Amino acid sequence: KEKYITDDEREKCRKVADAFAELYEIENILVVDAGRYGFVKLQYYRPPQGFEDAITFTDSQSMFENLWEEWLDTQLFLLAKGTPMAGMGYNEIFRCLPKEKQEELMNRKAGFAKTAGIE
């Protein structure tokens, strides 16, 4: 049977998935190991149909970037909720934040990368 992900990338993807565990608690997202097919990000669960969105990853770098964007967007949404920033786009919200908060958020990327073993 054909494999769509190398054993090395599969191990790296597993580390990336584990690094973003907190995201799955705060957002309607789940990342699952789909064996020889890679890892699948399931998003927007709607009963009874199930997940509306499924993205398959076979490389850890693109999976990391995707989950990082998801995490950052979620944080920005939560920060803007109930404020005048609520109607803004994510980039606008980020620019409105104090420099310290911007740095704090961006430093989390380095933390996730270290946990995931991404250079």
Language model features with spans:
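Short intrinsically disordered terminal tails
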Residues: 1, 112-119
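Negatively charged, low-complexity tracts enriched in Asp/Glu with abundant Ser/Thr
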Residues: 1-27
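Short, intrinsically disordered, low-complexity terminal segments
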Residues: 14-18, 77, 83, 110
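Short intrinsically disordered, low-complexity segments
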Residues: 21-25, 38, 114-117
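Assembly/interface hotspot detector across virion components, adhesins/toxins, and nucleic-acid enzymes
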Residues: 29-32
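Active-site or metal-binding loop neighborhoods of secreted/extracellular toxin and effector enzymes
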Residues: 93, 103-113
